[in-house]
Each structure stands twice: as C-alpha cells, then as structure tokens.
C-alpha cells in the first residue's frame, strides 16, 4: 500500500504551518545521521536536523510546533484509520552537491503505517523499496529494488506500510528538504 495525496491540508492552514516551520523561529536539533536508529551509521553527508512533535505514543510535546501540527496529525490518523500516533517529527536535510541517498531503514520494527508530509517543494525523492523489514538490521543495499520514488512537493502526503524499507535523498538543487515524518497504528 502506497498512497500519495496532493493538497492534503487546506491551503490557509498549510501556509500557517509552512510559514512557521520554514522560518527562523523553528527550532532544529542536529542529528549525525538523519535515519538514525538501528540501521543508521554515521558518515559524511548523512547529517540532518529534526524536531520531535510526538516522541511517545499520543503524547504531544509541549511546544508551539506540536500545537500547530495537532490538527494535521489527527486528520492523518483519522484518514488512514489508525488509533494511535506513535511518533512524529519534523526532519530537514540540507543541500549536498550531487545529492546523496540516506540509509534505507524502517522507522520502527513494530507494525505501523508511515507518513511523510512535505513542507516545501524540493528535490531529493523519497524511495520505497520492494523489500520489507524481516527482523534483521543488516541490509545489503545492492539487493534492494525500487518500488516507487516520490518527489517532495509542498502539501503532499505520502502514506505507506511502515515495514517497507525506505529512504530519502538530500537535495542537490535546493537549500533544504523539510518534511513531517509520522508513524501510526
């Protein structure tokens, strides 16, 4: 299951979110590997920035970002037929000459639905592979086959089975690529 919905949020609400998230008011936290966790290994160009909105199941952080994004996340949760928001965070990767593919990964080993909501027009597609998480963190990237590539487009929502291995790319033609990555069950 892979679904792409353009213009997911009402335009005036999306512009409110976008104006804040892409402004100097947005707090960002450095991460040495933006796809960190059991799959991520540090390396040149794998860094990025994030800001958690929901870190633990259904617990919104006490922040302006969380308040601003609550309605959007509830709309996602309801629309995909899930009961829980497991995790949600803003992610930003930055310009890298030539672009770079981040590490293929899953966001959680537990069954879930993953979403990516793009905050800006950029390059650096999200890639969803045919291969699924089968319990091992060792991935032979040379054996992965692409199921679908999705280009970052402002106000676009990508929904997919979170057990598909997936990744993103750093932008090669834009200053940044900003998205809201969320997981539901």
Predicted regions and their residues:
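Non-heme Fe(II)/2-oxoglutarate
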Residues: 1-83
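Catalytic core of non-heme Fe(II) oxygenases with the double-stranded beta-helix
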Residues: 56-185
């Amino acid at each position: 299951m892979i679904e792409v919905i353009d213009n997911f949020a009402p335009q005036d609400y999306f512009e409110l979110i976008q104006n804040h998230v892409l402004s100097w008011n947005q707090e960002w936290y450095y991460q040495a590997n933006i796809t960190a966790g059991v799959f991520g290994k540090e390396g040149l160009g794998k860094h990025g920035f994030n800001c958690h909105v929901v870190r633990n199941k259904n617990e919104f952080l006490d922040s302006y970002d969380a308040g601003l994004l609550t309605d959007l996340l509830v709309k996602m949760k309801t629309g995909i037929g899930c009961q829980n928001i497991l995790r949600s965070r803003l992610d930003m990767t930055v310009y890298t000459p030539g672009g770079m593919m981040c590490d293929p990964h899953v966001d959680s080993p537990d069954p879930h639905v993953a979403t990516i909501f793009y905050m800006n027009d950029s390059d650096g597609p999200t890639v969803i592979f045919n291969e699924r998480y089968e319990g091992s963190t060792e991935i032979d990237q040379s054996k992965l086959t692409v199921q679908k590539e999705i280009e970052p487009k402002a106000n676009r929502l990508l929904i997919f089975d979170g057990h598909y291995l997936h990744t993103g790319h750093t932008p090669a033609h834009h200053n940044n690529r900003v998205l809201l990555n969320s997981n539901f069950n």
